[in-house]
A protein has these predicted regions:
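Conserved core of the PLP fold type I
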Residues: 1-133, 144-161, 165, 232
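Short secondary-structure boundary/capping segments
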Residues: 17, 156-157, 201, 253-255
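Conserved glycine-rich beta-strand-loop-beta hairpin in the small C-terminal domain of fold type I
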Residues: 54, 229-240, 251-260
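Walker B catalytic acidic pair
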Residues: 139-140
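Conserved core segment of the aminotransferase class I/II
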Residues: 160-230
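Inter-domain helical "communication" segments and dimerization helices
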Residues: 217-221, 244, 248-255
Length: 260
């Protein structure tokens, strides 16, 4: 609904530093539906790069859409940019804020190199036949649950060339039964989506959309996330304390405790 898109746009502006007009937000019943729409939007003739290790079903979902997938290894700072270049992929699906399952936070250098990779041929990236050039699918998985420090700014907030598709879902924060996800499209991709895919009916219940819009508008969602984050931090602190007080203290090392 327009009201939910506006609520999400306001949330992204306030908490993720993203300036995205509501009309460039697409809502769907879960992230997997969005992955399928991205393939239809960008085209099946592309190679999609996915992180390895990564979300186990992602390659299968893209493969079911008849696109070729390239599995790209991770370095300490995120996706291996050299391997990405060598793969011939024109779409990179990444989780910069909190990579699953490793928990890696993409480094500033890797973010810069990834954005530079995507900008190659950006000046001629669109045609009457559809979008060309390279794109990044930024899956902002788990970004709300960073335990300490400043939130990790999304790639989308510094994307000046219109190469980043931003994805997020409410499933992690509101429960697996709450199947609402969304993506924020760059301006020209949003126009392509409206032209070629705008006929799709939204599969999310209007009642659920209205309820979520009000939940966000009234500040309940942010307070809910803060409570979850506080509870998770208490559980984490308790686990770490017990391990450090146990006979395992010399055998176990913790890292990335701020990542969620």
């Amino acid at each position: 609904s327009p009201r939910l898109r506006q609520a999400i746009a306001s949330y992204l502006r306030e908490y993720r530093g993203m300036e995205v007009p509501a009309e460039r937000i697409v809502i769907a019943a879960g992230s997997q539906t969005l992955y399928q729409l991205i393939v239809q939007l960008l085209g099946r003739e592309r190679t999609f790069a996915t992180e390895c290790p990564g979300y186990p079903l992602l390659g299968r979902i893209y493969g079911a859409q008849n696109v070729h997938c390239a599995s790209i290894p991770l370095s300490a700072g995120g996706i291996d940019i050299a391997a990405l270049r060598e793969s011939g992929a024109s779409v990179a699906h990444v989780m910069p804020a909190h990579q699953f399952p490793t928990g890696i936070v993409m480094s500033a250098a890797c973010r810069r190199d990834l954005l530079n990779w995507s900008r190659t041929d950006a000046a001629r990236a669109f045609s009457a036949a559809g979008p060309r050039g390279r794109f990044i699918v930024e899956d902002d998985y788990d970004a709300e649950f960073r335990m300490s420090g400043r939130p990790i700014a999304p790639l989308s907030s510094v994307d000046v060339a219109g190469r980043v598709i931003y994805l997020n879902s409410f499933t992690k924060s509101l429960g697996a039964a709450f199947r609402i996800a969304y993506m924020a499209l760059p301006e020209e991709l949003a126009a392509q989506f409206e032209l070629n895919l705008g006929f799709y009916s939204n599969t999310v219940s209007p009642l659920e959309q209205l309820a979520l819009a009000r939940f966000i508008e009234q500040g309940h969602y942010e307070r809910h996330v803060n409570r979850l984050r506080t509870h998770a931090k208490q559980l984490q602190d308790g686990l770490v304390r017990r391990v450090r007080e146990s006979s395992l203290a010399e055998e176990v090392a913790f890292e990335g405790l701020d990542r969620g």
